[in-house]
């Protein structure tokens, strides 16, 4: 039975997402997610000059990784992910396991 490890990585630094996971297995899919951009406008002077403003932006880059693995290798892959130093990034790990039930056994139980 195959198990999929799904990882969503959010970072402010784009080169981080491109170069950090260099040791990924060949059966890994990288999917780019849409970037989000937040723009903040701040008044430079609080008194007279209303037109004098300064803008700051915050861009969040996202990447979606899917690693296909066998069920008995799941622990090894998870510890490999924990050892990866993901400084400057926020990540979410989801495990997806598909099991197959035997139809004959289920009918005998009912």
From Swiss-Prot:
| Gene3D superfamilies, per database record | Ribosomal protein S10 domain
Q: Which GO terms describe its cellular component?
A: mitochondrion; ribonucleoprotein complex; ribosome
Key words, A-Z: Mitochondrion, Ribonucleoprotein, Ribosomal protein
GO BP: translation
Q: Domain of life of the organism in this record?
A: Eukaryota
Report the subcellular localization.
Answer: Mitochondrion
- Enumerate the InterPro entries for this protein: Ribosomal_uS10, Ribosomal_uS10_dom, Ribosomal_uS10_dom_sf
Keyword RNA-binding included in the entry's annotation: no
Question: In the UniProt record, does the keyword Chloroplast occur?
Answer: no
Per its record, what are the GO molecular function terms? Answer: structural constituent of ribosome
Q: Identify its protein family.
A: Belongs to the universal ribosomal protein uS10 family.
Q: What is this protein called?
A: Small ribosomal subunit protein uS10m
């Amino acid at each position: 039975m195959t198990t999929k490890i799904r990882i969503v990585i959010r970072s402010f630094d784009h080169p981080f997402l491109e170069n950090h996971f260099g040791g990924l297995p060949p059966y890994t899919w990288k999917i780019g997610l849409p970037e989000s951009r937040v723009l903040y406008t701040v008044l430079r002077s609080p008194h007279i000059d209303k037109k004098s403003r300064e803008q700051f932006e915050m861009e969040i880059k996202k990447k979606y990784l899917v690693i296909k693995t066998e069920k008995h290798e799941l622990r090894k892959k998870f510890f490999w992910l924990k050892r990866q130093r993901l400084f400057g990034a926020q990540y979410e790990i989801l495990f997806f396991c598909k099991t197959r039930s035997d139809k004959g056994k289920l009918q005998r139980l009912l």
